[in-house]
From Swiss-Prot:
NCBIfam families: PRK03633.1 (NF002962). Gene3D superfamilies: MFS general substrate transporter like domains. It comes from Yersinia pestis. GO terms for cellular component: plasma membrane. It is found in: Cell inner membrane. The chain crosses the membrane at residues 8-28, 41-61, 73-93, 94-114, 133-153, 157-177, 208-228, 235-255, 265-284, 289-311, 325-345, 349-369. InterPro entries: MFS, MFS_dom, MFS_trans_sf, MFS_YcaD, MFS_YcaD-like. It is a multi-pass membrane protein. Keywords: Cell inner membrane, Cell membrane, Membrane, Transmembrane, Transmembrane helix, Transport. This is Uncharacterized MFS-type transporter YPO1380/y2792.1/YP_1213. GO terms for molecular function: transmembrane transporter activity. The keyword Transmembrane helix applies.
Length: 382
């Protein structure tokens, strides 16, 4: 029996539309603020408020789904995101956009947890990997489409918000024709996240998720600003962002295969080294396209490999808590990355974006080069 049932396909269609809207706004919001002459640190704070919303959404998602179920919670989250998007049209100022992007971040995190949980509940032990792989591919595909749209349509605020809002409302429609059952509140014991964060065998994996959050949060939030300050148009910025995310899509399968065959520790070391190499290449004004490509290949695949490392020693009943801990770690990194990096960029130079990325990657590489107390050659379970 195929893993891709009718409800699953409809859910993924809704996710695709929702992700396109996220990608468009994540690129244009920093550019719109920059066009209004807001300082770089304020642009970074608005990006961080979005990731703060992600953290809050992650924490409340379980109870939200428990109370409303998958379908109703999905629809409510879409409505919240649409309202937060339309609110951007009211006024362009730091404090109001800080609030709107915070609400948008909550809605996005809710959608991610809802979709992931619905897919896991729909699948079996033999096809959950296929479902989550499809989820990741749809997410990145939607991100690329969103970036490419910036080269086709007008990027003016009052032109973009109406059709993005309509796209989010359209993303609600597929789940009107699909029903997902949800877990009752008495079906499983409460999840304890804190012991997972303190687990010694998972430390390098958790650190990897934090580093991945710093890296991707900074790239998503501040790379458009970096490129804009280089004199690029909004359409060109969208094209470069599409290249970055496309390289992440291309890198998913080979990195996963390498981790299975050669061990996750070796692959993590290679990934982090390539992140440093790509950052140095951009700082050295070498060819932008190949440098950004290898940076995306390594950076966008770091999180799943680190997550797999951390989950290796977790028992079946600990996986949910461990995954929640890893998502929280990633979100905290995504929150800290744009905040610290934007302040450094404002005070010194835009080049601090890639100096920061290379610096945190180097620190993690030093951790990985030490003898791990996890296991000598960590392989995925077959």
């Amino acid at each position: 029996m195929s893993a891709y049932s009718r409800p699953v396909l409809l859910l993924l269609c809704g996710l695709l539309l929702f992700t396109i809207s996220i990608a468009v706004l994540n690129t244009l919001v920093p550019l719109w603020l920059s066009h209004q002459q807001l300082p770089t640190w304020q642009v970074g704070m608005v990006s961080s408020s979005y990731f703060t919303g992600n953290l809050v959404g992650t924490l409340i998602a379980g109870r939200f789904i428990q109370q409303l179920g998958f379908n109703r919670s999905y629809h409510c989250s879409c409505i919240l995101f649409a309202l937060a998007t339309c609110g951007l049209m009211l006024t362009v100022d730091f404090w109001s956009w800080l609030g709107w992007r915070f609400l948008a971040g909550i809605a996005c995190a809710l959608i991610w947890v809802i979709v992931e949980s619905a897919l896991l509940r729909s699948g079996t032990l033999t096809n959950r990997g296929q479902l989550l792989a499809a989820y990741m591919m749809v997410y990145y595909l939607g991100t690329v489409i969103g970036q490419l749209l910036l080269g086709i349509v007008s990027t003016q605020l009052l032109s973009v918000i109406p059709w993005v809002g309509a796209l989010v409302i359209t993303a609600m429609l597929p789940l009107l024709f699909a029903q997902f059952s949800h877990q009752s509140r008495h079906e499983s014991p409460p999840i304890a996240v804190w012991p997972m964060l303190k687990r010694r065998s998972a430390r390098l994996g958790i650190n990897g998720c934090i580093i991945s959050g710093v890296l991707l949060g900074s790239l998503y939030g501040l790379l458009p600003l970096y490129l804009s300050h280089k004199g690029m148009s909004d359409a060109s910025v969208g094209g470069w962002m599409a290249l970055l995310v496309s390289s992440g899509i291309i890198g998913q399968w080979p990195m996963g295969r390498m981790a299975d065959r050669y061990g996750r520790l070796l692959v993590l070391r290679i990934q982090v080294f390539v992140v440093i190499l790509g950052s140095v290449a951009i700082l050295g004004n070498y060819a932008m396209a190949p440098a950004l490509f290898i940076l995306g290949c390594a950076g966008f695949t770091l999180y799943p490999v680190a997550m797999a490392w951390a989950c290796e020693k977790a028992s079946a009943d600990e996986l949910v808590a461990m995954n929640q801990a890893l998502l929280m770690s990633y979100t905290l990194g995504s929150l800290a990355g744009p905040t610290m990096t934007s302040l450094l960029m404002q005070r010194y130079s835009d080049n601090l974006l890639f100096i920061m990325i290379a610096g945190v990657a180097f620190v993690y590489l030093m951790m990985l080069l030490r003898k791990p107390d996890h296991q000598q050659t960590p392989y995925a379970a077959v």
